[in-house]
Each structure stands twice: as C-alpha cells, then as structure tokens.
Amino acid sequence: MDKPKRLFLKSKRSFRRRLPPIGSGDRIDYRNMSLISRFISEQGKILSRRVNRLTLKQQRLITIAIKQARILSSLPFLNNEKQFERAESTPRTPGPRTRNK
C-alpha cells in the first residue's frame, strides 16, 4: 500500500517585474497634477496602496500631496459628474385623480 511518490514540477515562467509607477525623477508634490491624478479614482477617491503598487512611504507622500491639493482647490474633494447629468425623462401620463375625503 505504498503510494508512489509524485513529483510536482512547477513550470518555469519568466517573471517580469513591473516598473514602479513613480520614477526616481518624479517629485511627489501637490503642484504635480499629472502625477497625482494617476492615483485618484474617477470618483475622486485616493486609490489604495495595493492598487497603486507603491511603497508605504510613497503612498503616504501621495496621500499628503492629494490632501494638500484638495485644500488649495487644485483638486475637487468629490467628482460627481454623473450627478449633474440629467437622465432622459419619461413622459408623465395624466391619469384620473381621486381625492379621498
């Protein structure tokens, strides 16, 4: 009742490390809007560190820069463009009105 030893061989795939989203020459600053806007969602929320693929220190600096830009009115706190778009209105059909007394 000896089970034969099975060899599990992993296929060797070439692992290619992704480039960091912030280069060494990029300055994390509240005035650098092209850099900051990459780390904000469509709704205006700050994306998480896991989504951004940043280090802890970089994420902290990005968060501080975004908050400074919001306070100085360079960035909106919320981006609710959908709220102001008017949906197609459905025509109202006037029906018989009854009043309860």
Swiss-Prot record:
Superkingdom in the source lineage: Eukaryota
Gene Ontology cellular component list: chloroplast; mitochondrial small ribosomal subunit
Disulfide cysteine pairs (residue numbers): none
Gene3D superfamilies in alphabetical order: Ribosomal protein S18
Positions of the UniProt region annotated as Disordered: 82-101
Main subcellular location: plastid
GO biological process: translation
PROSITE patterns reported in the protein's UniProt record: RIBOSOMAL_S18 (PS00057)
Record bears the keyword Ribonucleoprotein: yes
Keyword Ribosomal protein found: yes
Keywords from the named record: Chloroplast, Plastid, Ribonucleoprotein, Ribosomal protein, RNA-binding, rRNA-binding
One example GO MF annotation: small ribosomal subunit rRNA binding
Subcellular location: Plastid, Chloroplast
Database matches in HAMAP family: Ribosomal_bS18
Subunit structure: Part of the 30S ribosomal subunit.
Family: Belongs to the bacterial ribosomal protein bS18 family.
Protein name: Small ribosomal subunit protein bS18c
Organism: Platanus occidentalis
Phylogenetic lineage: Eukaryota, Viridiplantae, Streptophyta, Embryophyta, Tracheophyta
Protein's gene: rps18
